[in-house]
Amino acid sequence: MKTIIRYLRQEIKMSQQDLAESVGVTRQTINALENGRYNPSLLLAYKITKILNEATYGEDKDSFLSIEEIFKFSDDEL
C-alpha cells in the first residue's frame, strides 16, 4: 500500500509523534504506514485522514482528500 501521509504531514510540519498521539497509536506505527509496511484498520485510516485534512485545509471541506486518495492499495492487495 502506498500513502501520502509523509508528504501531507511534512507539508503541515507535523512530526510522526504528533500525528501518532493525535490518532492514538505509536510513532512506530506511523513510520510503518509511511513506509508501506503496515495496513491500517478502517478506523485508523479514517482518523489519520480527518486529522491531516483538518490540519492541511482547515474549514475548506471541498479541498479535503478522501481515504482512497491518502491510502492507495494496488489491485493485488485487494
How would you describe each model-predicted region?
Residues 10, 21, 50:
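Alpha-helical residues within the helix-turn-helix
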Residues 1-11:
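A short, Lys/Arg-rich alpha-helix, primarily the initiator
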Residues 13-32, 63:
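Short alpha-helical DNA-recognition segment
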Residues 35:
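Short, conserved catalytic or interaction motifs in soluble domains
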Residues 56-78:
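Short, charged recognition helix plus adjacent turn
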Residues 45-52, 70:
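Hydrophobic micro-packing sites on short alpha-helices
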